[in-house]
Amino acid sequence: MVSAPPQSAAASIARAWLGFTLLLLAHFAVRPLLDTRANVDYLLIGVLFAAVRTRPGLAAVIGLLAGLCVDALVPMAFGAASLAYVVVAFLASRVKAVFFADHVALTGLFVVVGKVVFDILYISTSGGLRGTALGMQLLLWTPVSAALTALVAIVLLTLFRPLYRPGA
């Protein structure tokens, strides 16, 4: 049986950026077509998967750039997505050794927590929701959205495991 040749670091980085770019495109091309209250956050999946492959400083820069892409489309809440993505990416990079194992349940939990933290930060800093609408969003739609995002992340990680493996 012939084993696969070892991959270079440049090939691993190129595959990771390809995966991130595809998730970025899905966030802006597929997500608007499925416009519901509980959306899958493809960009958050990309940011989390990129953050576990990098150090906290670079993860924060990736989060900032992803947040600026989102903030450019919502001038009323400019900076809210950037702040949320930076915090989530930084924290994800810090706890990667604990949560990003080769275990499906831990990966799902990692994405759920990341999505909940992102939504809490984004909604509280954007200032768009108040009162019962805020409670409904945080208590009903955020957990549903987090579960859907985690489900998609698990499916993507299972299908494209070599692309997102942290050590590859």
Task: Go through the PLM ranges and name each one.
Residues M1-A168:
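Terminal, non-globular segments
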